[in-house]
Amino acid sequence: NAAKNIFDYNETNVPFTVTSYSEVTGSGRPAKAEPWTITKYESSADGTTWTEGKPSMVAAMSSESGNGGTSAEARTMTFTNEYHDYKAEREKALRDATEENGKDLSMVNGSRSTANCYIVSAGGTYKFPMVYGNAIKNGVDNTEAYNPSNIVGSSTAINPFWGATKITSPNIVGATKAEVLWCSTPDLVKDVTIDGGYVKFSVDKTKIKEASAIIAVKNNDAEYPAYKSGNVLWSWHIWITSKDVVDTDNGYFMRQPLGFRHTKWQGTSYQQDRKVRLTVTQTRTGKTATAEFTQKASPMEREGETMYYQQGRKDPFYPENPMALQSNGGSNDALRRGLTLINSVKFATLMARPRKLWSDPTTKGNWDWMAISTGDIGNGEPYYSESVVANTTYFNLWDANNGQGHGYTGTFVKTVYDPSPVGFRVPRLA
């Protein structure tokens, strides 16, 4: 018997009583105490299918037997409390992880493969080579990532690709300084320097949590008055999260969206109410009785913030600025009209106002961040490179040989603009 048989996820003490005896009705003789034992545990995750065996949800039982009698014998079963603050647990794991010392983030299984995003899962010091996106793959120059040779539909494709200048080799040259453009947790990613052909930085173990940072390299040019600290030549996303977000099989998505960080992640490890059924057997007579108990689930609450990317761009929207429409008026102010690829890479505010949407989707489509008119001039220079045609959509920014757009079925070639970490790519629209 039990006063109740349904318990909340955090109610771990489950009291019940057993009364076990036998008597001959009408004999006038006193009832006989019958010793008893719990002879079987069964559990169910759905209330329909039952599995025999003591389940993990039962942490302890005060006693599995008794002497019997007409007086009830009290027992207590203890349930496990499997409610987790997964966000706190993940952050603790990041803090407890062994600190890295000069780890090269581009080395994968003994071979170098570069990317625009590197995952960090512990405090310490790190480095990565100053290379355009995935321009090095498995230790060799990945030319197809920035100078594709088999484009289908070349009138709607850009080739070669551009950084601050035309990309002709994997290595970025001319960089004189490196800095954190922004970080979701202030001062978490710091000590950013250039050392030879590498960018070096540190992650503060005492502040580590799920976060994102953008590291950029610059030169000493002050091409535009607003950017006296130098032009950005390229930038990289440092994603601080658990290693298991990329622990997937070939052909599967990452376990979390790119750059995701939790603001809340808590609940029980089980999402349906779970049940345990006890079978009590009298030792002498073999008679049985059952009792069923339920432990309720706590719904999983999982919330967070992720990165948003405009089609073809390697960098996410700046998280502090809302998305907005760019001007379709007569102004030639690039910060109002939005920027083409070459200039968005060069500007130190490449994460901010240049990330805008076109206000005339019927003629341009809001994906056309590179669509410009020949009259768009700034500082005497057009906002496009020699290979960019005005008012054109470029389909191959993430899919190197795809100048066709929807329906292209050729081999996917990841580009230097792809924001994904090594081993992953932006999926093609099915």
Residue ranges of predicted features:
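Surface-exposed, low-complexity/disordered Ser/Thr/Gly/Pro/Asn-rich loops and linkers
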Residues: 173, 181-187, 363-416
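Short beta-strand edge segments in extracellular beta-sheet folds
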Residues: 235-246
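A short beta-strand micro-motif common to beta-rich folds, especially ectodomain repeats
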Residues: 209-221
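Conserved hydrophobic ligand-interaction patch in extracellular adhesion modules
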Residues: 252-260, 300-325, 329-334, 338-341, ...
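Extracellular/luminal low-complexity segments enriched in Ser/Thr/Pro
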Residues: 194-210
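Residues within well-ordered beta-strands of beta-sheet-rich folds
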Residues: 214-216, 237-239, 252-254, 425
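Short, exposed coil/turn segments at beta-strand boundaries within extracellular/luminal domains
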Residues: 221-235
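Solvent-exposed, low-complexity, repeat-rich "mucin-like" stalks and linkers
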Residues: 2-189, 247-284
